Design a protein with these regions (language model features):
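Active-site acidic/histidine clusters and adjacent loop/turn architecture
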Residues: 70-140
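N-terminal module-boundary/linker segments of secreted carbohydrate-active enzymes
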Residues: 23-98
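Stable alpha-helical elements in mature extracytoplasmic
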Residues: 29, 65, 117-124, 158, ...
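Catalytic cores and adjacent binding grooves of peptidoglycan-active enzymes
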Residues: 151, 156-225
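Long, low-complexity repeat tracts used as extracellular stalks/passenger repeats
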Residues: 4-33
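Active-site-adjacent loop/helix surface patches within enzyme catalytic domains
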Residues: 123-161, 165-169
């Protein structure tokens, strides 16, 4: 019957949505969203190419930020909505390098993030700007409302996407879903493993989407402790 068919289609849609959300759930506890705040026992492990910056993470700094985030977003976690989320967002201006006619020139970029993370974000991009790579920024995406049922940390300004076209999101089989091609050795806009961008985020407790089962090279999110 039509009702049975619709039920099957709904089940498939729910299953597909669950799979799409699984990567962030693997790294960030589902309970954080539900205001229970019980971290999962398994933490993502550094890969073999990680260097001493992994061990330079200020755990106390992360814990203090997490406590501030939980307090700041307490109402949102109970009743998530776009209006509630946007009450906690701020715009920050950060220094960046642009590529113009093959040369790197200094500029600034504005990005909307969770107010509690604003200082961290400024420090991160100041460090990237001062790094030896002079990593060029074409586009930044911070806070983006993706629906009340979305698990994305972009909903609460705790995620940043960098140069999406050159740092694509992949499916589990390595096919590109968003963006074009990740080429860290040939494309200056592609994020390098253990480069200035990864180091600046990682040592402040942000997780790179390269760690996901479905790679998301553009993505950095402030992780749950």
């Amino acid at each position: 019957s039509d009702s049975v068919q619709k039920s099957k289609e709904n089940s498939k849609n729910i299953e597909a949505q669950s799979k799409n959300n699984q990567d962030e759930e693997d790294l960030y506890s589902y309970n954080l969203i539900r205001s229970v705040f019980k971290p999962k026992s398994k933490e993502p492990q550094p890969d073999a190419s990680s260097d001493d910056n992994d061990r330079s993470v200020d755990i106390g700094h992360q814990e203090r930020l997490q406590n501030k985030i939980r307090e700041e977003l307490a109402d949102y976690f109970v009743n998530p909505s776009k209006e509630e989320a946007e009450r906690h967002m701020v715009w920050v201006e950060v220094p960046v390098w642009r590529l113009q006619d093959g040369k790197k020139v200094s500029d600034t970029e504005r990005i909307q993030v969770l107010n509690v993370l604003a200082s961290d974000v400024k420090e991160i991009f100041r460090e990237i700007y001062n790094g030896h790579e002079k990593f060029p920024i074409k586009r930044l995406i911070g806070y983006t409302w993706r629906g009340q049922n979305s698990m994305s940390f972009h909903n609460t300004g705790r995620a940043i996407d960098i140069n999406p076209e050159e740092n694509p999101q992949m499916d589990i089989d390595g096919r590109v879903l968003v963006g074009k091609k990740w080429d860290p050795h040939g494309n200056p806009y592609s994020i390098k493993p253990n480069g200035d961008v990864v180091k600046a985020f990682r040592k402040r407790g942000w997780v790179w989407g390269e760690k996901f089962r479905k790679k998301d090279y553009m993505h950095f999110g402030f992780k749950e402790m």
